[in-house]
Regions:
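Flexible, solvent-exposed loop/hinge segments and secondary-structure transition points
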Residues: 21, 52, 119-129, 135-137, ...
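Conserved, well-ordered alpha-helix/loop/beta-strand core segments that scaffold catalytic motifs
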Residues: 88-131
Length: 361
């Protein structure tokens, strides 16, 4: 007999049936993973299934850390007689049962709840097919809140859509568009090829390069580099990249983490798409810095903006803060990895931050 009821209630029922004298009724304890927060952080946590009394991790942290979190069964080995009884002086070895390890995340639950609520509002108003949001500490790389839609309740498996399982923040890629402009401009300022006050002719919103037309959203003339960021000029950013040169632009994109995985404990994770330098065409240098012709995951974009925000220091994104063994009390801390700044010029950070602030002022 299986029971999903409260454990104390189950024990009372078991005792009552045993005293009644009924025959042919047997009891076996079984355990089921419970997710008390329901949809909260569902894609990241993942879930497990039961396969012939064996717990099988399916997605998320459950799958990545399956070996760590799986409990071990106890076992006793002994020598026995022909009758199957343990020999009094035979060898006996015992292995105690043990619980799985505990994972402590970098997530801050109040912020997580707010993020989930805001994402629900966005879905209600704009009705996109999918959406995701990530909050991170740029100095440590800690992911402090993350959510995506569609999502699911891991406690309710009926009619669950497998498309909702995917961790879109790690698997999805898209052309970043104007998100890339501050990255390219930061590289140009750091190389010293431009300053925030360097002026470029934005051609009244129409510019031909390599036989192809590049447009701005509205006509603009002479703009400083700061104004190019403020007004999100495609033409101005493309001209800045031409001053950098293809090799330096490629180095900048890769220094900010594009084209490689972030290493978060979620599988699968994409590396995005950044063509190797030898496969660039004539248009690449004017399109890549405005986020066209390359593709990145949400996590890669978050990591690159952590680098922008913290003074040029590449950081490893963290979802897990520490792993604890409940039996021994031993704690394995997942270290914060913060590399030396990629900037050569000490003024680069302040310059790019001031430009980005001007966009919202």
């Amino acid at each position: 007999m299986r029971s999903s009821s409260d454990f104390d209630e189950f024990e009372r029922l078991k005792l009552k049936i045993s005293k009644s004298g009924f025959k042919g009724i047997y009891f076996r304890n079984s355990f089921k993973r419970n997710y008390p927060k329901n949809e909260l952080l569902a894609n990241i946590l993942g879930f497990t299934n039961l396969d012939r009394d064996r717990v099988v991790a399916v997605i998320g942290l459950e799958k990545f850390y399956d070996r760590n979190m799986t409990s071990g069964k106890g076992e006793t080995r002994f020598e026995r007689s022909r009758d199957g009884l343990p020999l009094a002086f035979g060898n006996i070895s015992r292995e105690e049962a043990h619980d799985g390890l505990n994972l402590y995340l970098t997530i801050r639950e109040p912020l997580q709840a707010i993020l989930e609520e805001e994402l629900d509002k966005l879905m209600e108003v704009n009705k996109p097919t999918a959406a995701y949001a990530i909050m991170a500490d740029p100095y440590t790389g800690d992911i402090i809140a993350v959510a995506q839609r569609p999502t699911f309740n891991p406690n309710i498996r009926e009619n669950m859509n497998p498309q909702a399982w995917r961790n879109r923040i790690a698997e999805d890629i898209f052309e970043p568009g104007s998100i890339m402009k501050p990255i390219a401009v930061a590289g140009a300022i750091d190389l010293g090829v431009v300053t925030p006050e360097t002026r470029f002719d934005c051609e009244r919103g129409r510019w031909f390069y390599g036989g192809k037309l590049l447009r701005d959203s509205h006509p603009m003339g002479l703009l400083t580099v700061s104004e190019i960021i403020q007004h999100s000029s495609n033409i101005g950013t493309a001209k800045i990249a031409l001053m950098m040169g293809a090799r330096q632009l490629d180095s900048t994109l890769r220094a900010f983490g594009y084209g490689k995985k972030t290493g978060v404990p979620l599988k699968p994770e994409t590396a995005g798409i950044v063509r190797p330098l030898h496969r660039w065409d004539k248009l690449s240098i004017t399109r890549f810095p405005i986020g066209q012709g390359i593709a990145a995951s949400p996590l890669q974009i978050v990591r690159s903006y952590c680098i922008l925000a913290n003074g040029g220091h590449p950081v490893n994104l963290r979802l897990v803060d520490r792993i604890e063994n409940p039996a021994t009390g031993k704690v394995e801390k997942i270290p914060v990895v913060r590399q030396p700044s990629i900037y050569r010029n000490k003024n680069t950070h302040r310059a790019i931050i001031e430009m980005m602030k001007s966009v919202t002022e």
